[in-house]
Amino acid sequence: MAKILGIDLGTTNSCMAVMEGGQGTVLENSEGARTTPSIVAFTKSGERLVGQAAKRQAVTNPKNTVFSSKRLIGRKYSELTEEDKKVPYEIVEAPNGDAYIRVDVGGEKKTFSPQEIASMVLAKLKADAESKLGETITEAVITVPAYFNDAQRNATKAAGEIAGLKVRRIINEPTAAALAYGLDKKSNENIAVYDLGGGTFDISVLEIGDGVFEVKASDGDTHLGGDDWDNAIINWIIGEFKKDSGMDLSNQPDAIQRIKEEAEKAKIALSSTQSYDISLPFITADASGPKHIQLTLSRPKLEQLTEDLLDRTRKPVLDCIAASGLKTGDIDELVLVGGMTRMPAVQEMAHTLAGKEPHKGVNPDEVVALGAAIQGGVLQGDVNDVLLLDVTPLTLSIETMGGIATPMIERNTTIPVRKSQVFSTAADNQPAVDIRICQGERKMFEDNKLLGNFKLDGISPAPRGVPQIEVTFDIDANGILHVSAKDKGTGKEQKISIQGSSGLSKDEIERAKRDAEAHAEEDKKRAEEIDTINQADSLCFSVERQLKDMGDKLPADLKREIEDKVTRLKEAVSKKDVTAIKAGKEDLESRLEALYKAAEAAQQSAGAAGPMPGAPAEEEPSDGPRKAKGRVVDAEIVDDDK
């Protein structure tokens, strides 16, 4: 049975794991790393790069290198803040109002949804996992922030489908971390999972023990993460440079990309050192010449710059503990998740809020993927006696008279869940009702996130308040909502599976899947072309070396013929003309037998006449060490296959 891939699709980095021998195992990517940057780039030649390859060229190609796209997934353009738009690439409004990304692909402007960008990262993880395991991967469990709304969950599921994965389950990141932490725990524990990643913050309180994982409450902030710490450092660097030089770098994408990389390095370094020297030579220039940035950022200064960000984790944690029905003193373990939790100030804040020293036994970068793999094992039947009881993070409501949001399912309700309520008409002889659904905690409908709407018509004429309309909300195990409305008088029913107002339609998902499949073929073809070029290059090198070694021992006409063929093949290689390379390689290989025969004949002739020039003389017998004759030089071994 093929394995289910557990994927932590992160804002900054992604990680994948599978169950092997009853244990979760993190899989390395094709570069040998255990995490993959969630970055996609498009080059001038139209090539698509994903992961480390995309990250490496970001400084030279900032406008076409997309990072942190998870912060856009399932969101409307109108919901974005100015801070969200402070990226070198272009964010545009799609016809349906979603936030999309516009880049230059081989000289042509193309627009992608965040789901499509995410699918490119997922497709790389899938391909790397298949290569590592030697089997086809078709199914996955993908994690999302606990505080993701319905639209964001649907968008993540769509990204998996585009990548060619059947998404067996969408699981909350803190819940996945708790699974990995507590799989072998027998005694009951109350644990708090404090998850601060690249783009989102989650806090969950769970009761675990003897295979039961019950989420008591979840809270968080989907717009708070490591990117915000980076931005605080970036803004400080830009401000300091402006004070010194009078120049504003905020509208120079190339400079911003370099500053972003340096800001990220500074943030990481300051988790283990007290100060970091920021050095960015030739960052820009004016009439007086080139300008450089040379600054020192201390840990206390970083903590001062980001104090307000860290403080934003306080309320969700306290609210979550209160909603769980526990007190701070009832928390037995504090599990830290996400790269940002390596920062001493973050650890101290988590410790203060939860009243516990952080648990040190989990890797914050890998624990979520391991939990996703365990959930995959549960779904496949490889992991037994595990019961996972998660909750819906936000209240789900319908609009009633006066624009009120009337709750159908309260936040922190255990899922899956199904709830029904009976409503009526607001006017006499009303022939239809509009069912509008939202997600959020505000009292007025318009202040919450609109998820979708549909119409139930054909209601029999009757005075206001007489018709009975039963509305049912059904949340599945993925946390995705299905809504139905039924006229109890006529039996007429209307249903909607909320795709989220920021989701892709089925047709759009299918189109994106076809594009992804075509790109997979394209990638395969490109890899084959590169292999052909490398083989030809290696062949030229090998033949040239043999010609040189043989010297004048070869017939002149054969030597000239082969030299001509090598020259033609090298020209084709330099032009990357694959058709010409294949023909030239075939042509050259057809004459190699003649070359080998001539070489053999020359060697036999040389053997009869004594050693060939450059050949080692036969060793004389000796009873002990001899003094070396001539010069002794360092030897180099050349591997013809490389």
From Swiss-Prot:
GO terms for molecular function: ATP binding; ATP-dependent protein folding chaperone; unfolded protein binding. InterPro entries: ATPase_NBD, Chaperone_DnaK, Heat_shock_70_CS, HSP70_C_sf, HSP70_peptide-bd_sf, Hsp_70_fam. Pfam families: HSP70 (PF00012). It comes from the Bacteria. Residues 600-616 have a biased composition (Low complexity). Residues 623-634 have a biased composition (Basic and acidic residues). The keyword Zinc-finger does not apply. Keywords: ATP-binding, Chaperone, Nucleotide-binding, Phosphoprotein, Stress response. The keyword Metal-binding does not apply. The modification Phosphothreonine is found at T200. Induction: By stress conditions e.g. heat shock. Residues 600-642 are annotated as: Disordered. Acts as a chaperone. Belongs to the heat shock protein 70 family. This is Chaperone protein DnaK. It comes from Akkermansia muciniphila (strain ATCC BAA-835 / DSM 22959 / JCM 33894 / BCRC 81048 / CCUG 64013 / CIP 107961 / Muc). The lineage of its organism: Bacteria, Pseudomonadati, Verrucomicrobiota, Verrucomicrobiia, Verrucomicrobiales.
